[in-house]
From Swiss-Prot:
GO molecular function: metal ion binding; transferase activity
Organism of origin: Treponema pallidum (strain Nichols)
Lipidation (N-palmitoyl cysteine): 23
Organism lineage string: Bacteria, Pseudomonadati, Spirochaetota, Spirochaetia, Spirochaetales
UniProt-annotated location(s): Cell inner membrane
Name of the protein: FAD:protein FMN transferase
Originating gene: apbE
Length: 362
């Protein structure tokens, strides 16, 4: 398995010209797609636009430059990241941090409080013992895991914003040996930044996919070969948690919405016939045992969808419903082990079942 610090540029900008130039003076829509391995995962951005190709090229270049820069800030798996430097100062004085890191930590601690710790950005000490998704993943020694959990209290993370313009923001990890790990929220945070960047370039039709964290911006175009291409909602697939992932079990139609799914199938290892997945329960320190196979969150902000997907998977169905009532405009789709599917009111009519083994309850 490869470390998330790998930078491998797998492709240059692919521009699919579906109608060259203009037709009768009308600019036609062009589809642009770019993919790279960065932030430890495959990141894809697809854009539809009538704007000059050079402008779209420039915007996509900015997107992937942003991702490369932010990996140097937010990665828990790079020794040279800003987050690693902060973790190294745990138990000492406050540390001046990058404003993007500070903003992300603010939101992460908000969701930690709201979820009662089911989402916990300070779980790094325990996560490192498991090392799931990397080389040498292993079941930790029980005593070592118990000790690590004593260093996972998110309430020991203290933020202080600069009170004047230009004043530094600081973060203090009050307990020695504690470690932040933002893997359950960072991709959502970066997806939001990408959407802001695309919008600033007057690009209003795009699909951002950061390792399965989706943001569907605006409406897509249908047949881009037509000068009057139809605008359609994006169809986002939800996989069978026990399938190969090659074909979706469900499809949900969305626009201006992030879709993030958490499930036990994403990263795991097996020992002695037992599967250990990567979503750790902060109470037990072990992979979460829950009554759902996967949870998909639909939200206007990908940061929120990312954090809530993890929290809801750990909490299970009933407690998740209680939590989500505090977030108007956020919807959820739950897949249960018996292949029942429950979706909240805001999206249930947008769900199409493609695999007849799954039953959408209404």
């Amino acid at each position: 398995m490869k470390s998330s610090c790998v930078y491998w540029r797998i492709g240059v900008l692919v521009c699919i010209l579906c109608g060259v130039g203009s037709c009768g003076g009308r600019a036609r829509v062009r589809e642009y797609s770019r993919a790279e391995l960065v932030i430890g995962t495959l990141c894809r951005v697809r854009v539809y636009s009538k704007r000059p190709a050079a402008e779209v090229h420039a915007a996509l270049e900015e997107v992937f430059t942003l991702l490369q820069q932010q990996e140097m800030v937010l990665s828990a798996n790079r020794d040279d990241s800003a987050l690693a430097a902060l973790n190294a100062q745990a138990g000492s004085a406050p540390v001046v941090v990058d404003r993007s890191l500070y903003a992300l930590l603010e939101r992460a601690l908000f969701f930690a409080e709201k979820s009662g710790g089911a989402f916990n950005p300070a779980l790094g000490a325990x996560v490192k013992l498991w090392n799931i998704g990397f080389d040498r993943a292993a079941v930790p020694d029980p005593d070592a895991l118990k000790e690590a959990l004593t260093r996972c209290d998110f309430r020991q993370v203290h933020l202080r914003a600069g009170v004047s313009v230009g004043a530094p923001h600081t973060v203090q990890l009050a307990q020695a040996g504690m470690q932040l790990d933002l893997g359950a929220i960072a991709k959502g945070f970066l997806a939001d930044k990408i959407v802001q960047l695309l919008t600033a370039h007057a690009l209003d039709s795009a699909l951002v996919d950061l390792g399965g964290n989706i943001f569907a911006l605006g409406l897509k175009y249908g047949d881009v070969r037509s000068a009057a291409a139809q605008r359609l909602e994006w169809n986002v697939g939800i996989r069978d948690p026990h399938g190969t992932g090659q074909k979706p079990a469900l499809v949900v139609s969305v626009r201006d919405c992030s879709v993030v799914t958490s499930g036990a199938y994403e990263r795991f290892f097996e020992r002695d016939g037992v599967r250990y997945h990567h979503i750790i329960d902060p109470v037990t320190g072990f992979p979460a045992h829950t009554d759902v196979d996967s949870v998909s969150i639909f939200a206007p902000r990908s940061t929120d969808a990312d954090a809530l997907a993890t929290a809801c998977f750990v909490l299970g169905y009933e407690k998740s419903c209680a939590l989500l009532r505090e977030f108007p405009g956020v919807d959820a789709l739950f897949i249960f082990p018996d292949k029942r599917v429950r979706a909240s009111a805001g999206i249930v009519d947008r769900v199409r079942v493609l695999d007849a083994r799954f039953v959408l309850e209404r």
